Amino acid sequence: MVHLTADEKAAVTALWSKVNVEDVGGEALGRLLVVYPWTQRFFDSFGDLSTPAAVMSNAKVKAHGKKVLNAFSDGMAHLDNLKGTFAKLSELHCDKLHVDPENFRLLGNVLVCVLAHHFGKQFTPQLQAAYQKVVAGVAAALAHKYH
């Protein structure tokens, strides 16, 4: 559960309705893989990830980024039940993929940066603070199975 004020919840959902999940998702996952290159080990089947340009133009990175943001959209629709919303994904990432849960926090922070880049002055410090709460809640929900 994310503790947002009514104004924060309205602001994050209003902005989220404007997000192009394909563009933002691809950029967020691509940036994660470039900025934190050790995360690339989970994406061996994605082909060429040898340079930042290769990562950012990789069709599989873009497609998976869209998939990630579609799941995040489900969370945005269920901010009061993030653990339930992400229970199956938490189990998958813990038991089968063995993803370090710290990577969820890293991706959340990258997503906030990408949102700031895409929305400029619309992405006020107050909105950033609210989104930091959301991505922290999503990261905690995804890490829940690890506890």
Curated annotation (Swiss-Prot):
Keyword Methyltransferase (UniProt): no
GO CC field: blood microparticle; haptoglobin-hemoglobin complex; hemoglobin complex
GO molecular function, one term: hemoglobin alpha binding
Family matches, as CDD domains: Hb-beta-like
PROSITE patterns associated with the record: GLOBIN
Binding site for heme b: H64, H93
Domain Globin: 3-147
Xref: PANTHER family: HEMOGLOBIN FAMILY MEMBER, HEMOGLOBIN SUBUNIT BETA
Name of the protein this chain belongs to: Hemoglobin subunit delta
Organism: Carlito syrichta
Source species taxonomy: Eukaryota, Metazoa, Chordata, Craniata, Vertebrata
Gene name for this UniProt entry: HBD
